Amino acid sequence: GAWKLAPVAGALGVGEALGNYNWWTSSEADVTTRACLFDDEYVFNADGSFNNVQGSETWLEPWQGVDPEACGAPIAPHDGSNPATWLVDEAAGTITISGLGAYLGLAKVHNSGEDGTPVDNTITYSYSLSVDGNSMDVTISGFNAGVPGATWIFKFVKVAPVIAVAGAWKLAPVAGALGVGEALGNYNWWT
């Protein structure tokens, strides 16, 4: 399915340890300022393929040659144009994204740095899925050799599928397609 960053304060954060995002945390204002990031989709397809869907703009930073950081056209290879895959290890609680330029959260963050160039074009994240399966916290460590426990967090929400009710509809040509009764689910008067 498709996921987006949760449109809330704290959807992105980084700090010296898991659970301690004291270096920087996104604010409520960032949801608007970085709207081009919060509308990006991270799509896990049933066939194991993965897509970064950014549309015409995403959030760009100085490491990509954009200073000050701002919304702009996605820059290759972090533009969703390359094939990528995903793999979940439920026992380990990890998601591995493989493919040139593929990522979750921010393109710069990977297991050995913050420069957008992961080893073997592969990034492994830890994840925690909510009970209802509609939200997911993703964390990653190892990017800061000076502070080995340093961790980024990305909070995601599942994108609800669009259900189209527009257009022409007709009753199914089966017995019981139309009925009436004294209560919902009880069509005892006529079917």
Language-model-detected regions and their locations in the chain:
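N-terminal helix-cap/turn-to-beta initiation motif at the start of protein domains
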Residues: G1-K4, K158-K170
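Short, exposed beta-strand-loop hairpins at the edges of beta-sheets
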Residues: D137-G149
